[in-house]
Each structure stands twice: as structure tokens, then as C-alpha cells.
Amino acid sequence: MKRNIIFSGLIAATTLLTFASCYDLDDMNRDPYGLEGADNAGGEVTPDAPDDSKYADINLNYSVSKADSAAYKKTLADAPATFRNFLYQGYYNDYQITTNLSHDIYAGYVANNQPKHATKSPDFGYSDGWSGQRWAHFYTERSTEYRDLLRSYKFNDTPERYKNMFYITRIYYAFLALANTDTYGDMPFREYVQAKVPETNNVQYDTQEQVYDAMFRMLEQAVDSIKPEDASQYKIDKDDICYFGDAEKWCRFANSLRLRMALRISNVAPERAKQEAEAALNNKYGLMKSNADNMQTVPKHAPVEMGGEDGGGDENGLAMCSVAYGGESVLSKDMEEFYRNLSTGGKDYIIKKGRNESETKQIDPRCLVCWYRSNMTASTLASGQDALRNDFVGCERGAQAPDISMDPLKYSLTRTVKDGASKDLPDDHWFNYSRPTVWFGYAESLFLKAEAALRGWAGSNLTMDAEGYFRAGVKASMDYYHIADADAEKYINGIVALNDGTFQSGDRERMLEAIITHKWMAVFPNGNEGWADFRRTDYPALHNQLSNFSGGDVPNGKQIKRLLYPNSESQNKYYTSHAELQQKNTQGTRLWWDVADTNDAAGNRLKPNNFR
């Protein structure tokens, strides 16, 4: 293996987001496949005896040299710290440039309010430094941590003792890989799954179908192999910042993830989708049981007793982009409209009109805890108080100056207290700097079950019909936000789809739109999942972007479908020698599981068909 050259400022790069709202990395010259430590830890590998199991191509079916084995034994002491960073940075690293200015906007959750970002990724313009960072974080940093952890767990004197942690690490790697393939499509995977070090500048791609196949088998093998009851197993508890060493929760998460993935491919591979879904729905560990099972990241800013490190930076990602950076990320017009229109049972709020005059309106109670009203100022942000003469106002995605402006702030920002109380978690300022970010929540798992029931899938863990799980999903989302039971009940009783005959109509497409739209509300602010679900189902019915600076890469009137591979792939011989990869490398190209376009050539919304 050739030695890979690593950018010497990796650690600094991961912390820049704390100190600057955004930065352009277009000039960064970095090998995205440069696995850290590949010179002394990659080593020469020797194949084991032939493996004819169905997991042969994902197993670590090789041995390393005695010297490397000895080195890996020594790194076992570092496993807790490595695992902690693996979990923390997984979806979170450089959140603004890798996610907020792309996925969160494409999902319809937020809009860009910073004129200097216009024409870039928020408006379909490709920003190589930004996309390249997402790619590099996965292939360089997270894959290095994954490789080191797996090899440490296997190449020691008692590998059976580390079996649970071996497979827990693989579950999380599959979780990260899902976000990567759902961003780009086809991608290098097979060598990384096996914790190998690929040859520099000649890294083989797998089709997205192959990537999904490998991820399904990773999850199946992991859940079948983990033994939560085995007290002899090595455990990482405090540094497992997701589930604190609870192996059963990891198994429930894996089953929930497997169901998410099964539904993702339901339009392109319905038989495989049903097989994987029913396996998850019949597994003895079940799916997520409550909001206590949420897969989330606690910011380092949070106090230690909350699971953080009581640091001065690394705040909640969305709160940073919205409030800490002075209003760059704001409520979208799409989300504002859904807050207002999905139920007639919203919560009252008052707009002051004068000394003795006011207007009472209703809105989704989650909006009242997540967003400030419009026209916030430095003083009102410092005090954490709404501008009570104003209303909630969302920004259209793709808006340009002067319709977007950092001064004055025209649109709603996240409810965040900037100063002394930033470490607290008040219910009425949900996006305080210490608030965890949920990447997969209990509410989502219930909406997944609703769709599974709608599709006629079966399982011992599927005990209600689609409407029952739909109601439960909305309630779980309200519970997550600590909405009072009376307000939650009023909202649910007023949901339009529960009062207009949708679930009695027999029209599965109509029912699916209700399920996905309310699921989209519950998944907020996870743009990775919101955007993927929108591309898969074409729900919810989002507005078209006002601006398109893709240079024709995304046809006018169309929705963006993927991100481009980073420019560094021009150095990858495999990529440059496969014309089909280059031909598919446009932001308007649908991924494997995205079987139908959202809009026609004139930009008009097409009627979705999710039951082929």
C-alpha cells in the first residue's frame, strides 16, 4: 500500500465551525481517501481460509502481521475515546457546510438568509469545498476510526470478549454510510466495510444497490451476533454517548434503521424491501420503544451531567447556524405553511397590534417552542424574548437579496438563548445551545411502522394499522418537544387528514402523503432524512426553489437530486476510467431508489406513484 498524505490540520478543521460561520475550502488539496495512520496500521494482510458465508464480502476474513496485531492490542486502551469521537463527529462534523447549507435546505426545513451564500449550495450551485468535506469526513476520519476499532477488537488475544462492541461499531458505520450513499449514490464501500486500506487513487466504487445490500447484511449480522445478556463482554459505557453501553438499545436502533432502509428501496426493489422490513419487524429486540431510544448527538457545549463536555464551543448545530451566526439559517416558507395548515387544532398565540389591540392566531404548538417570531434584534435575542408585534415568517428557499438580509432580520430564527442560560434546556427555547440533535427518533420509527402497515407488511412488532401508528407518531413527536397533553390532543384531533376521510378512503397514495408529511414534521431538523424521504416519495409537497445557480446541472423547474462527487475524484483512476460514473455525476440525476421525478419539464408537480 502506498502511504496516503493527510492534511495536517485535521483537528483544527473539525473545530473551525465553532469560530466562523462558514468557510470556503475550494483550494484545499487533500486526498479524500487518505486514511489516517495507513502507513503503520494498514499493514500487509493475509487472507484467512475461504469464507463461504453470506457475509463473506463484509467480514474481516484476513489476518494481520504479528507486529500490527501487537500494535492493535495497545490501541485497545484508546477505544473508548476513539468510539466517542466516532459517534460525536459522525453526522455533526462541519455541520453548516456539510448539511445545513445543503440537505437541510433541500429537505425544505430551512432557508438561507445570508446573501454571501446565495448562488452556492443553497441555490443548487456546487461548492466543492463543502461537498468535499462531507466526503472526506466519511472516508478519511470516520473510516479510520471504524477501521482501528474493528481491528483492535478482532486482532487481540480474546476477540470473543469484544464481539458486542465490534458489531455495535458496525451498526453505527452502516448508519453513517446510509447518509453518504443517499447523498451521492454509487460510492466506494466494500474495502471500507472490511476495515481495509484501499490503494491510493484507485478506489473501486460499488453501485448504490450493492451498498444497500451490504448495509442490510451488516445490520442483520450485528443484531444476530450481539449478546446483551453476556456479562463477560467488553463494554464502553460513559463514552458511548448514544446509548451508554446498552446493547439492547443498539439492537433496537439497528432494527429501526433496517426498516428505514427497507422503505427507502420499496419503489425500486419491493420484494427485498418487504423481506428486510419483516425481518426487522419480527426481530426479538423490536424497534425503538420510546424517546429514550432516540439516536442523538449531545453537543460538547452541554454540561457533563447532560452528556456533554461543558465546553465553550460545539453548540447545537442548527442553533449555531441560525442564532450564533446572526441569522444565516431561518425558518422556511414551506415549514411555516405546514405549521399553520396541517391541523385546525393549533395552539393560540397573540400578536399585539397596539396598546389595547391584539390578534389571536393558532399554530402547531411545536412552532412556538422552536422558532422566534420575525424581526428579532440583538437585544431581543440577548433576552430570549419574542418581538410580540410580529408573526412567524418563513423565507422562500432560493430567495435573493434584498429579500434575504442579515440586517434587518426579516424571518424567524430558532428559539435560542445566546448568553448565560445557553447551557440550560428550557422547554420554551427548544434550540438552546446545549440541546441534543436527534438523527433518528422514536416518532420516526412509528411513522415507519405506519407506512409498513399501509404496504401490507407484517411482523410481531407491528400491532396497529396505519392510522394507529400515524396517531402514535404525532403524539411521540409532541412528547419529544414536551408539549402539554391537552395541547397535543387538541392538535391531533384537529389534524386535517384525520377528519377528511383520508384513512377511510382506501387511497393508499393519499394516506401515504399524510404519513410522510407528518413524519417530515417529526424528523425536523434532520435534513439528511427529510431530503431523502422527499426524493423517494415526492412528499411533502414543497415549493420549487426560486433560484437555480447549478449552471444547467439541475434543470430549471426541477428539484435537486444528489450532490456531485468532489473534484478530488479526478485523481481516482477507477472513477476516471468508468464513464458511467462520470455520466451520472450531475445534481439532477436521480439515485437508484428515486424512481420518478418530482416535477415535469415545465416545473409543475407530477402526481406521485409510490405503489407500483
Pin down the residues of each PLM region.
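Membrane-proximal, proline-rich intrinsically disordered regions
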Residues: 22-105, 155-156, 552-612
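Short coil/turn segments at secondary-structure boundaries
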Residues: 99-102, 370-373, 527-536
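Sec-dependent bacterial lipoprotein signal peptides
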Residues: 1-21
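Structured, solvent-exposed acidic/aromatic patches
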Residues: 73-77, 112-172, 176-481, 505-510, ...
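Short, compositionally biased low-complexity segments
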Residues: 25-30, 43-63, 111-122, 185-193, ...
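Beta-strand acidic-aromatic groove motif in beta-rich domains, primarily in extracellular
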Residues: 95-105, 185-188, 274, 532
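C-terminal functional modules
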Residues: 474-612
